[in-house]
Amino acid sequence: MKTPARGDIWLVNLNPTLGKEQQGLRPVLVVSEQAFNRLGLCVVCPITQGGQESRFAGFAVTLMGSGSETQGLVMCNQPRTVDLMARTGRFVEKVTSHVHNEVLAKLQTIFESGS
């Protein structure tokens, strides 16, 4: 299996989940660096066709018009660490650097202090 790289979209089953976590078989965007991913885990953001709550809160990046076959919203407010091999993930495609840079910028606002 290929080592996932930042900017890859993989199809993976996110179950089991709890509460408001995205669930089920869905595309995810890999946001962690390949050197980290070689350790067996990846940080991903789920992609959804819904996600209105994330969009209105400013934590979603659209794939519409990006040139990718995968469409929907990257939910930057739900980063998650997963083992893609254990979850039998499958590589789908790679997004443009513009898309993954926009996702990383949204993630940065979550983890940086405003003060």
Regions found by a protein language model. Give the residues of each.
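Conserved functional hotspots at enzyme active or ligand-binding sites that engage polyanionic ligands
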Residues: M1-S115
